[in-house]
Amino acid sequence: MLLTSVLLLSCVGCAQDGRKEPDAEKADLGLTAEVKPATDFTAKANAAVYDELDFDDKQEYEFATRGLIDAPETLELKDEDGTILWSQEAYAFLDDYEKAPDSVNPSLWENTKNNHAYGLFEVTDGIYQVRGYDMANLTVVKGNTGWIVFDTLMSVECSQAAMQLIEKNLGKFPVKAVIISHSHADHFGGIAGVMTKEDKADETLSIEDQLASGKIPVITPVGFTEHSVKENVYAGKGMGRRSNYQYGILLTPGVTGKLAQGIGMGQSTGTVSFLTPSYEITQSGEKLTIDGVE
């Protein structure tokens, strides 16, 4: 009873010691949820980057835009309810500035402009990429009779839109195989936009028999399913929290908000799908011939 009384008195003393509540202290410092312009310190730090890097070197942008075949004037993908799942239109403000605003690191600004280059591109003869339709790229290789698809983006809606762009410009051909490079969701989550579960080849067959069956082999590195679970289930929450701080994912796109995430504009928020592989690559350098392509 005595201990309880002492604790109560201690708490009363804490409330009456003259210190302000945390929210009041933040308000005095100007720490509110409203977007603010760059401080002088931030503006000077960002401006100094122009002296550190050669911004006249446009090679990265030339690489990002070379081989463009087609791109819609605007790109914004929505679900049936009108919810935006992926948007390049949200970054149209990039065209309003000749150089980075003082609120943005110039290197990040250039990276964002590079990632804003979206559409269907020819990489080389017979190899094409859809870029800027999700965090990753969707690549197709032309075989004798159809497409070999490398990586299927994060969301079904995005991969469907990517395949439609390919079909519009290059013709409609069957998918002969899907190859997933690794276990990050932005490389496999859109697989249901490329093929169905019923399309998948029988994993009990040899890869040669799978290819001959008329079904679609799903080819991955060994351990793909295990690592997909470990990374996206076990570590997913921690990775998500880290990326919120790292990239400002919850911010609105803008010069005082969210910009690119290095390898892409960010992750789409559509339907994520998954298929187990029908064939796993177990050794580096293993060679397969798929639809006439080695």
Question: Where are these predicted regions, by residue range?
Answer:
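Metallo-beta-lactamase
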Residues: 122, 212-215, 219, 223-294
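Bacterial signal peptide processing site
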Residues: 15-17
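Active-site metal-binding motif and surrounding structural segment of the metallo-beta-lactamase
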Residues: 145-146, 156-217
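N-terminal pre-domain segments of enzymes
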Residues: 19-112, 116
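Active-site metal-binding loops of divalent metal-dependent hydrolases
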Residues: 152-153, 183, 223
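C-terminal motif of bacterial Sec signal peptides marking the signal peptidase cleavage site
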Residues: 10-13
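Conserved beta-strand hairpin/beta-sheet module of binuclear metal-dependent hydrolase folds
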Residues: 113-173
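Bacterial N-terminal signal peptides that target proteins for export
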Residues: 1-2
